[in-house]
């Protein structure tokens, strides 16, 4: 039995513990999907899958609720696979190890997958709990949301029967989400030429580590360090001065996670090693001063390494460094309409260098299409100046807020009655699948709720136990209050 079984509501936590035990990173959700299909069939529910693998489970209304508007509870099957550098974990094979730490549930050295595992568990717990009162009910579990919203893109019209969709992918209890940002991936690929490292040069690995990382939408406004940007800043400041040879540069693992670590392999002449060490120490102190409140565990390490690879020629080195150093990152503009909400942002998520190419992979988010288009244009111009090949792809729409949404008003009234306080109505600067659902289901009334999750998309991810109880109370009470057709 899982340690989580002592928590309330127990059915939800037991299901979440089971979800944690089955590997389900993006593109590897099939084992979990098969388990859920079998679980639902065993309980006698109607189950279907579509051509992209989405799961739809139907349950009839409880007695006396047959005339209520049908509702679909929606979550995504995949989780973001992030781990600490010293954690040995294969996300495709190893279970997540959740544990209780005071008021929170965390995972040992990895992302927890509360995003969106708690939402998924809550939907399945509603199906399983015979004490929950509800009208005609569907549960929709989508594929590969975190890596490209594949399931939402593939969702066909005339499959769902519901009039109301409750998305469970929000991460702040007491807040009701009625809109979200859209996004687009942007890559710049730069050709590299190499030459042998001169004799008498010593090779080092420069590592920037210890950053918090996090969700590139929900936490982009916080001002956390971006490992790719911070490491290239050092190279931009000192490459020519040190006659530095750049052999390798890699940073970040996911375009939708703020990168926590970046690595550069460099070589300098033996008589400049002491200068390099001094500059590294000085730069580390500069960063610790600048990010003293946000990144207390930041570390910049310089380690001597063996090397048999060629280095970039000076032109390739300088072009790459200048391109990455000049690439914007973070908040581009705050919204004039939604106060306190980021309108447009950019995350320089992944930098991958091979022998003759380097790819810079960014994720652009915006509440408005024109904001997204502007950043694409800016990055395209920058890439072309550097001679890089650029591509924008994988665009997904935002979810336009509807101030007159009946379900949003119902959630607000229900929350206020249950907890004697007014919830915040919010637009989130992150991608929810609701925007894509609006295309095949334009008349669907939608809202997004969830418990408090901090540090999503990072090994610091944790979910607040009490908030899960509040979220469950709200969700189950809301299902009782859904109006008649």
Swiss-Prot record:
Zn(2+) 2 binds at residues 76, 115, 169. Optimum pH is 9. Zn(2+) 1 binds at residues 115, 146, 457. Keywords: Acetylation, Cobalt, Dipeptidase, Hydrolase, Metal-binding, Metalloprotease, Protease, Zinc. The active site is at 78, 145 (proton acceptor). The modification N6-acetyllysine is found at residue 296. It comes from the Bacteria. Pfam families: M20_dimer, Peptidase_M20. GO terms for molecular function: dipeptidase activity; metallodipeptidase activity; protein homodimerization activity; zinc ion binding. Disruption phenotype: A quadruple peptidase disruption (pepA, pepB, pepD and pepN) does not grow in M9 minimal medium, grows better when supplemented with casamino acids. InterPro entries: Peptidase_M20, Peptidase_M20_dimer, Peptidase_M20C. Coiled coil: none annotated. Its EC number is 3.4.13.18. The keyword Ligase does not apply. The keyword Hydrolase applies. It catalyses: Hydrolysis of dipeptides, preferentially hydrophobic dipeptides including prolyl amino acids. Binds 2 Zn(2+) ions per subunit. Can also use Co(2+). Its cofactor is Zn(2+); Co(2+). GO terms for biological process: peptide catabolic process; proteolysis. Disulfide bonds: none annotated. One of its GO terms (cellular component) is cytosol. Inhibited by metal chelators. Optimum temperature is 37 degrees Celsius. Dipeptidase with broad substrate specificity. Requires dipeptide substrates with an unblocked N-terminus and the amino group in the alpha or beta position. Non-protein amino acids and proline are not accepted in the C-terminal position, whereas some dipeptide amides and formyl amino acids are hydrolyzed. Also shows cysteinylglycinase activity, which is sufficient for E.coli to utilize cysteinylglycine as a cysteine source. Belongs to the peptidase M20C family. This is Cytosol non-specific dipeptidase.
